[in-house]
């Protein structure tokens, strides 16, 4: 899954199921001495990062036999992992950040207490995978405040409606699309979306403006 130089570098957060170890799958070779570079197909990587416990089976890589599930129990919002990757990789750590785009999945629903073990377990997963909590903490950090002030950090997350859709309701894509269209149609979000697009088109210009 390794790409040639010049292509977009991508990383996915996953968990190694047998030892419950959070890790990262990359389409590039990490030069950091503590990082392990795994070999897998794009399909295997995508399936692994989407294999949420209680909803999907873990994914076994055909070539190596390693078993994986998603990184959501620990890192459903991977912004800290992404920035940590930038900070530790040789050749990247001294570069300025041009733009950070964070896409949320909406606010979580406050469920009533139930005696069903499955419901309790799913409730625990929902609590620990709340990506908005991570977003709020990052936005209030020194780096988050600086990136937001200089129009280099953007967070989009639908505030209402998504919490009523379950993780395995894949047939509800039209409803998700309608909620997203309504959310992005608000004037304030439209302005932020335009600014985000501008930053993504020329992140290097952001770095020059905010050295």
Regions found by a protein language model. Give the residues of each.
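Conserved catalytic cores and adjacent C-terminal regulatory segments
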Residues: 1-211
């Amino acid at each position: 899954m390794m790409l040639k130089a010049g292509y977009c570098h991508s990383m996915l957060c996953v968990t190694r199921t047998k030892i419950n170890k959070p890790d990262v799958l990359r389409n590039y070779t990490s030069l950091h001495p503590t990082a392990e570079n795994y070999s897998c197909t794009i399909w295997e990587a995508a399936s692994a990062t989407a294999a949420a416990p209680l909803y999907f089976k873990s994914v076994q890589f055909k070539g190596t036999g390693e078993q994986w599930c998603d990184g959501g129990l620990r890192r459903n919002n991977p912004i800290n992992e992404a920035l940590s990757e930038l900070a530790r990789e040789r050749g990247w750590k001294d570069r300025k950040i041009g733009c950070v785009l964070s896409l949320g999945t909406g606010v979580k629903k406050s469920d009533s207490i139930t005696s069903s073990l499955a419901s309790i377990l799913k409730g625990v997963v929902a609590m620990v995978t709340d990506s908005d909590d991570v977003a709020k903490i990052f936005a209030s950090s020194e780096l988050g405040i600086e990136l937001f002030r200089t129009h280099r950090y953007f967070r989009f997350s639908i505030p209402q409606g998504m919490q009523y859709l379950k993780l395995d309701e894949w047939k509800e894509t039209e409803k998700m699309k309608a909620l997203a269209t309504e959310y992005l149609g608000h004037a304030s979000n439209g302005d932020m979306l335009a600014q985000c697009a501008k930053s993504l088109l020329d992140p290097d210009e952001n770095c020059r403006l905010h050295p």
